[in-house]
Amino acid sequence: YNGLPHVERTLESVSGLETVVVDHGSTDGTVERVRAGFPAAKVVEQENLGLAAGWNRGIRETAAPYVLVLNSDAWVVGDAVDRLKRFADGIPRAAWVAPRLLNPDGTLQPSVRGFPTTWRIATEYLFLRKLAPRSRLLNSFYGAGFRHDEVREVEFAKAAAFLIRRQAFEEVGPFDEEFFLFSEETDWSYRARAAGWRTLFYPEAEAVHVGGASWRRESGTLFREQVRGHLRFLLKHRGVSAAEHARRVILAGLRLRSVVFRGERGAVYRDAADWVAAGPATTLLESTR
C-alpha cells in the first residue's frame, strides 16, 4: 500500500524471479510505476484487507515450492534468496526461514521475538525489559538480547522478509486475516509449531528493512493495531482471562508512557490508552478500525 519510494528497490533485489505484487489500493502511483518498470511482475490489485490477506493472495498466485515474502520497504542483499532456499532444502520441517534484518545504514535491526504471554506483555508495556535486556525473564518478548549471528530455531521473527515453504502453508493453513496489520506472523508461527513445523533464523542471508528505523512510523492508528494484534493473539491462543489481564497491563503501561513521553509520541500513547480503557478485550476486538 503506497509503496513508493522503496518498491522499485524491492523488486530490483529479486530480479529474474517469478514476482507477484499485491497492491491494496495505492494512491501514490505504485501500481503504475511497477507496471512500467517491471513488466514481468504480476500485479494483483485488491482492496486493503490487511497484511495477512495480501500475503495469502500473493502466495496463492504462484505454485512455487518456496515463496519469498517482502514488505514494500524491504529488499534482499546479494544472493540472499538462494541462501535461504539452500538452507531450507536441508531442513525438511523448516516452514519459515527468516534472514537477518538490517537498517538502511547497515546496523542490525533486531527481529527475533517470543510468543506473547500476559507476563511478556507486561515486560514490554511496563518497560521491564529495559532493566535487563539480556534477561530471559524480563525480555523474552524481544529475544532476550539474542545476538542475531547464529542459526537458531525461534518462536517467531519479524515478517519484513521471510521464506515460507508451500507445503507448510498448505498444512498449517493461510494467515489469519482477522489480524489486520500486526501479529499475523506470530499467530501463523504459533500454529506451525503446534503442527510440528519449525521457524528458523538464518543470519547468512540478509535483507534491509526501512520501516523499523524509526518509531515515528507508528502513528496512532498503527500503534492501536499493534495493541489489537497482541490482544487478538492472546484471546485466540491463551483465552479470555489472559487477554483481559493483558488489556489491564497494557492500559497501565500506556498511561505510564503518556506521562513519560511528551509531544507527538505522548499523544499516541494517550490516544491508545483511551481506546484500551474502553474494553473489555473482547469488545475492543469487535470494534471497527
Descriptions of predicted regions:
Residues P116-V154:
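Short, flexible, basic/aromatic active-site loop/helix in glycosyltransferases
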Residues L4-P5, S13, D23-E32, V77:
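A conserved acidic beta->alpha catalytic loop
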Residues L17-G25, V44-E45:
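Short beta-strand/loop segment that forms part of the nucleotide-sugar
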Residues Q46-T62:
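Glycine-rich, basic loop-to-helix element that forms the pyrophosphate-binding segment
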Residues R147-D149, E155-E206:
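A short, conserved alpha-helix in the catalytic core of glycosyltransferases
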Residues V77-S111:
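Conserved donor NDP-sugar-binding/catalytic core segment of glycosyltransferases
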Residues T221-L231, L235, V240-R289:
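Non-catalytic, C-terminal membrane-associated alpha-helical segments of glycosyltransferases
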Residues V67:
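Short aromatic/hydrophobic "clamp" motif used to bind/position activated sugar donors
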